[in-house]
Amino acid sequence: MTANLPAAPMLYREFSTQAQIDAQYNPSIALADPAAPGKHFVAQSALARASLKQHLDIPFGATVHETLDIFPADAPNAPVFVFIHGGYWRALTSKEFSGVALGLQRRGITTVVVNYALCPWVTIDEITRQVRAAVAWTVRNIAQYGGDPARFSVGGHSAGGHLTAMCLQTDWARDYGLAPDPIKAALCISGIYDIAPLRYSYLQPMIQLDDGVVRRNSPAYTARACATPTWFTWGGAETSEFARQAQSMHAAWGALGNQSELRPIAGADHFTVLAGFERPEGELCAWLAGQLGV
């Protein structure tokens, strides 16, 4: 007779193995060609830099990685969108995401793409600090590039969605001497708002999570009262965990009386969800334009 073996302990929620967690959080696993999204982003970014006005590699901090790429709108005093790229905090740069400006520029919105240092050379705590500093610098200085700091928005994708949510937790008045809520709209795309499961994933050797990093950098558990209208979105074809992450953050945000929307991009995967920035009529461009009054 075969003895009944004890059930495997759970690493996170209903997941007992790294393979199960990786299947949820590694969006490249399901792709026929894992290199295709990167090639697309590079091509769109090259198009943006070849066709749009730009100010590249503007420093906002003391380190070589702390730079901004600014794509001004044609009209002066334009609303502003700061984009924070993904790459699970350990890959990619601002240069792969210049294409975000393609649709927004035609909507009359100035786009600022943030570059930051990466894990494992720095921690997620430090990346969060750098991104907050980038936002503060842009609020103070974007008027020099034709932007209107009174119509200022922030958004990001994947790790950038997480970092956008971390920006929304910031005490801007205390820490940066700004208005309490300088961000007038926020767009969190396919973000990770409870980073605990990634401690048990293929990413752990690079991002090096511990209890303190998880606690300090899981915005689903540190939400504050905030006046910024926010859209938590993800690709409708993404895994159940990406949907649950957005749902959990939306619930935490709403529990404090904050204003947010919860709605996926129909049919999109983790990468094609960004197509909404490539055309002015794209869903992401349209939402931002509505929030910023253009």
Residue ranges and their predicted role:
Residues 2-294:
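Alpha/beta-hydrolase superfamily serine-hydrolase fold, recognizing
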